[in-house]
């Protein structure tokens, strides 16, 4: 086997090792996140999601699977990725500051009882941290997907929030667990709404 193949395999092995470790420490906060989301949507609320770069893609991924479906047919669930409207983002970034692009949307769209899914691998993304502050001002629950100890965002969370913090320092590995956590969240919400289905 060549060095390149060995390096590629190392990525797979490292990712698998982290996921096994994360299964032990993240199952409880993910289950708590499921309950927070269920309480929100069954009361007629919605989930707002945000992030930057790969985390923005994860926010869109989550919203697509909530509004559409995950693996089973069901009515759409209310979710909005705040990073998808380029007109709003560029207007807010230009007229205010890039750190305000999500907080302003939370102020405009969020209601008490809604949930903010805040995704940042470092926990230090200024615009995501500002969105968390705005969500608290609107009496929303925050579900934070972070890594590296949670950063500034972790320090802002309250007792009613949920912190899903991946125990790793490397961005790529954290992102890989984030998308698995999102899939676990989507699956568990479906199970609670539709009943059990075998994992095959």
UniProtKB/Swiss-Prot annotation:
UniProt key word Transport: no
Cross-referenced Pfam families: SIS_2
Domain SIS: 37-199
Keywords, alphabetical: Carbohydrate metabolism, Cytoplasm, Isomerase, Metal-binding, Zinc
GO cellular component: cytoplasm
Its EC number(s): 5.3.1.28
Catalysed reaction equations from the record: 2 D-sedoheptulose 7-phosphate = D-glycero-alpha-D-manno-heptose 7-phosphate + D-glycero-beta-D-manno-heptose 7-phosphate
NCBIfam families listed in its UniProt record: PRK13936.1
Function: Catalyzes the isomerization of sedoheptulose 7-phosphate in D-glycero-D-manno-heptose 7-phosphate.
Homology family: Belongs to the SIS family. GmhA subfamily.
Protein name: Phosphoheptose isomerase
Gene of this entry: gmhA
């Amino acid at each position: 086997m060549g060095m390149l193949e060995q390096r590629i395999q190392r990525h797979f092995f490292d990712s698998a090792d982290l996921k096994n470790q994360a299964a032990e420490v993240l199952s409880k906060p993910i289950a708590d996140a499921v309950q927070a989301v269920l309480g929100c949507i069954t009361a007629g609320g919605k989930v707002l999601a945000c992030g930057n770069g790969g985390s923005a893609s994860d926010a869109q991924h989550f919203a697509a699977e909530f509004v559409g479906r995950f693996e089973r047919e069901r009515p759409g669930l209310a979710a909005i990725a705040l990073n998808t409207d380029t007109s709003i983002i560029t207007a807010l970034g230009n007229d205010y500051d890039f750190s305000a692009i999500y907080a302003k949307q939370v102020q405009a769209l969020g209601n008490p009882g809604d949930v903010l899914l805040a995704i940042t691998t470092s926990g230090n993304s200024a615009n995501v941290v500002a969105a968390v502050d705005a969500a608290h001002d609107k009496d929303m629950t925050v579900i934070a997907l972070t890594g590296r100890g949670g950063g500034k965002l972790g320090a802002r969370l309250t007792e009613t929030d949920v912190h899903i913090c991946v125990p790793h320092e490397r961005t790529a590995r954290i992102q890989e667990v984030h998308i698995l956590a999102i899939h676990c969240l989507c699956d568990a919400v479906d199970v609670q709404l539709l009943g059990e289905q075998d994992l095959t």
